[in-house]
Amino acid sequence: MAGQQFQYDDSGNTFFYFLTSFVGLIVIPATYYLWPRDQNAEQIRLKNIRKVYGRCMWYRLRLLKPQPNIIPTVKKIVLLAGWALFLFLAYKVSKTDREYQEYNPYEVLNLDPGATVAEIKKQYRLLSLKYHPDKGGDEVMFMRIAKAYAALTDEESRKNWEEFGNPDGPQATSFGIALPAWIVDQKNSILVLLVYGLAFMVILPVVVGSWWYRSIRYSGDQILIRTTQIYTYFVYKTRNMDMKRLIMVLAGASEFDPQYNKDATSRPTDNILIPQLIREIGSINLKKNEPPLTCPYSLKARVLLLSHLARMKIPETLEEDQQFMLKKCPALLQEMVNVICQLIVMARNREEREFRAPTLASLENCMKLSQMAVQGLQQFKSPLLQLPHIEEDNLRRVSNHKKYKIKTIQDLVSLKESDRHTLLHFLEDEKYEEVMAVLGSFPYVTMDIKSQVLDDEDSNNITVGSLVTVLVKLTRQTMAEVFEKEQSICAAEEQPAEDGQGETNKNRTKGGWQQKSKGPKKTAKSKKKKKPLKKKPTPVLLPQSKQQKQKQANGVVGNEAAVKEDEEEVSDKGSDSEEEETNRDSQSEKDDGSDRDSDREQDEKQNKDDEAEWQELQQSIQRKERALLETKSKITHPVYSLYFPEEKQEWWWLYIADRKEQTLISMPYHVCTLKDTEEVELKFPAPGKPGNYQYTVFLRSDSYMGLDQIKPLKLEVHEAKPVPENHPQWDTAIEGDEDQEDSEGFEDSFEEEEEEEEDDD
């Protein structure tokens, strides 16, 4: 058996293959994830939305005050250098000679495969004359030619070449290692050990340790775990939090503490500026000692948030701190919503009376505070202040108008263009157009609700203890799209009404006099209709003297006439009875036909119901698969916010609650992917008692005030189906056992009879 040899790369050819593949594995994914986004595309996007969002703070901070950032340039330089190295190594690999080539004697002799023996000998003579050492030729080349000639003419050499790929027989197997030989050289052993020790014993543990230390401090939503603990404690302590208490707890987050967050700063000037703002606000209680809510960092965050809600001007040294605090508020409020929901679930699972769940008002106040923080408005301010150029001074002209009395954004949008223009007459044309552009960009979301019980035979029948699934389909449109459609429909309806106004007046006048003239005609018609209802003619009564004379003169004739009248009456009665029988037969035939039609309709209806249930089942399966596989982007639509320092996307909270009992029925679902349409499933257990229940589905925005949607949800809960005591499957099993017992008894009796016969014999 041939020996095996392991050798390192002395020439460096195989090392280039390894190095090229290693650099490619780093450069290609890094380019995909780290290449800076095209700044021109971002500038074009900002230019397109300038008309609507031009007055927003986040827009002005991004566009009007661009800060030179060297990080994208550094990324591009590093990535381009990596690609240059990768291309150089690939070029180097393409130019390296192949050390291990398959031995082919035809190539050595410059012959085509399949040449005849005569051609081989002829070519060998020509090449041997050319490369023979005695005639000044190349000795190595001559040996290769002789070896190739022997491989093609000698039987043993040809057999070795066909089996082992070499005329000399099997050779030693060599394994190359794609590392340069100087790495394992004894002279460089200390240097190699130092590099390995530095990489795997110093750099790697430091990187992993620092990453682990930072990651264990944060939750999955990048919120400090200490902040979650603070929120859990104070939410449990104060189960019914008003807005003032909620702001106080929100400001106690560790994200604002410089000890836990390096981005949070504390300046010496805060000791002078913060007390001044406290005196201007005038509604901050400093007597309570409730750490960390009364710590300096928490007090500073609370003052900055209250000044933002009041739209107060603050010193420039505090503007940066206020912007940092406001950027953290949406995520912190979402964490507080999660904490409240977790405590509600814990209270339901525990039967202890001491564990008190937070109220529904606390949850809704968190959602309202998110809207307030984004828009920079206090709780009871008008939603119209979210629009540009509408401030406290001119708001009274809009809300206290004698004719319109606009209170909400929907009221303002629903007006006609002329009425809206007269209402906002105090605005210039450019400002009015800007207000209309912003107003038309506001979202208008509609909800379609359907409740059912999935994975059940009768999905529409809700029973006690079943898991109710409420499928909510959200459709998002802009205010401009919705009310333009409504106004176009109204205009289309009003135009033909105006065109035909004269004709309608004429018809009305005609109707007046036509009703008077038609009075007697109607009575005549009614009399005519009453005549066929009479079956017997009324007899004409004659005077008594005339009757006696007629009887005496025509006695027999009178009797015959009387007999004829009796026969006519009998014939009339017979015809009437025949007509009644025919009517009954036709009525029975109609009833039979109607029964058949009703049966067909029921069958068709049942088939349609089955098809609808099957389609719903398939759609639910597809929704689950999409939810598991698809990862939708959370970039929906930018929010119009005049005083928020960061571009925020439209997100929503969707949940079900009982307004009468003030309880939460289903946990809030944070809808972060609503661009046009979105389907959301809300699940909750059915009530424990049968009856009719009135719930409410809430859709609350986390960014806009006054755009929440509320829709009632009625549930009719029935008694749970009884557990079947007898089942056909069980009956078949019992019958099988009885048959087996009968067969066993029959076999026993047959054996007894055979034994008796043997005894008789």
Curated annotation (Swiss-Prot):
Basic and acidic residues bias (residue ranges): 583-609
Cellular compartments annotated: Endoplasmic reticulum membrane
Basic residues: compositionally biased ranges: 518-537
Segments for region (Disordered): 492-618, 720-761
Keyword line: Chaperone, Coiled coil, Endoplasmic reticulum, Membrane, Phosphoprotein, Protein transport, Repeat, Transmembrane, Transmembrane helix, Transport
A GO CC term attached to the entry: Sec62/Sec63 complex
GTP-binding is among the record's keywords: no
Transmembrane segments: 15-35, 70-90, 189-209
GO molecular function terms noted in the UniProt entry: protein transmembrane transporter activity; RNA binding
Coiled-coil portions: 598-636
Lumenal compartment spans: 1-14, 91-188
Subcellular location, principal: endoplasmic reticulum
Cytoplasmic side: 36-69, 210-761
BP GO annotations: post-translational protein targeting to membrane, translocation; SRP-dependent cotranslational protein targeting to membrane
Residues with the Phosphothreonine modification: T538
Role summary: Mediates cotranslational and post-translational transport of certain precursor polypeptides across endoplasmic reticulum (ER). Proposed to play an auxiliary role in recognition of precursors with short and apolar signal peptides. May cooperate with SEC62 and HSPA5/BiP to facilitate targeting of small presecretory proteins into the SEC61 channel-forming translocon complex, triggering channel opening for polypeptide translocation to the ER lumen. Required for efficient PKD1/Polycystin-1 biogenesis and trafficking to the plasma membrane of the primary cilia.
Subunit structure: The ER translocon complex consists of channel-forming core components SEC61A1, SEC61B and SEC61G and different auxiliary components such as SEC62 and SEC63.
The name this protein goes by in its record: Translocation protein SEC63 homolog
Native organism: Pongo abelii (Sumatran orangutan)
Organism placement in taxonomy: Eukaryota, Metazoa, Chordata, Craniata, Vertebrata
